[in-house]
Design a protein with these regions (language model features):
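Short beta-strand elements at the ligand-binding edges of bilobed clamshell
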Residues: 38-49
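Hinge/cleft segment of the Venus flytrap/periplasmic-binding protein
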Residues: 47-95
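Conserved beta-strand segments of alpha/beta enzyme cores
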Residues: 22, 42-43, 78
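Structured segments of extracytoplasmic/periplasmic soluble domains
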Residues: 7-14, 35, 39, 58-66
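Residue-level detector of short coil/turn "hinge" positions at structural boundaries
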Residues: 15, 43, 68-70
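Hydrophobic alpha-helical
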Residues: 1-34
Length: 95
């Protein structure tokens, strides 16, 4: 995302809350959360790679008309919005 933001900045294209381009990320590192808090991003959510294969299986089952009988959570994932994120969120959840 840093590269994308640098390209937008270089092209003088505004990004973030109320601007030309909506920016979303899925890593929740401290830098990204600080950018979110500053309004330069719109949303950032945690995305745990350990859940990817499980989620892929669920998608395939649903596409085949199957139902999911139980819910498995490997880790709770958080999502943060630029209008509600706090410094406490950055400190507690930024990696």
């Amino acid at each position: 995302a840093k590269g994308a933001l640098a390209a937008l900045d270089k092209a003088n294209i505004s990004h973030g809350v109320g601007k030309d381009v909506i920016v979303m990320g899925f890593d929740c590192n401290k830098w990204a959360l600080e950018e979110l808090k500053a309004g330069n991003w719109n949303y950032d959510g945690q995305c745990n790679p350990f859940q990817a294969s499980y989620i892929d299986d669920i998608i395939k089952k649903l596409e085949n008309g199957e139902t999911i009988s139980e819910k498995t959570i490997i880790m709770d994932e958080k999502g943060f919005d630029a209008t509600t994120i706090t410094q406490e969120d950055v400190d507690n959840y930024g990696i």
